[in-house]
Amino acid sequence: SIGTMYPKEEVKIGEELLRVEHLTIRHPFNYHKNILEDVSFTLHSGEILGLEGLVGSGRTELMRALYGQGDILTGDIYVKGKKMDIRSPKKAIQNGIVLITEERRSDGFIGMMSIKKNVSLSSLHKISRHNILRPILENKFVNEYMEKLRIKAPSAEVAVENLSGGNQQKVVISKCLLADPSILMMDEPTR
């Protein structure tokens, strides 16, 4: 049975990580319409929260809004109990929120750049001191994630556009994990 192959892990539910209260988000293409209205939920450490719905139901727009890329009309977002105004991906990452987007080619990586540069993009603060990049530290982190996620490439200098789709997705996941998120959002991650 599937329960035998993949036994349920006992996970301790911890502190509140994210609370969304009465969020209303404008439709991305029809500004006279809202795609989501009055959405509220809470996410705790150790929980997995799934969103489902038909195409156009607002799943992607909700995640993009929490990542600082949506048009939030009303509502509040709390991260670890503190009210936040997340208006950019940089602000989301600073608050421990990352997003693996549905469209990795347009939103997840820069194809002509190397694996190393793509993985490092969202964690420049971790691999630099006084705004000066520390290549030894960058190489350490990138090689660690290439090994952990089994990214198949001759080196970290290979352009991401030259990788298979699965390895491209692993680069995007590595980039997100290197940022040490407390909240990892995935929009159609197996696509």
Model feature map: region roles:
Residues 1-191:
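Glycine-rich phosphate-binding loops of nucleotide-dependent enzymes
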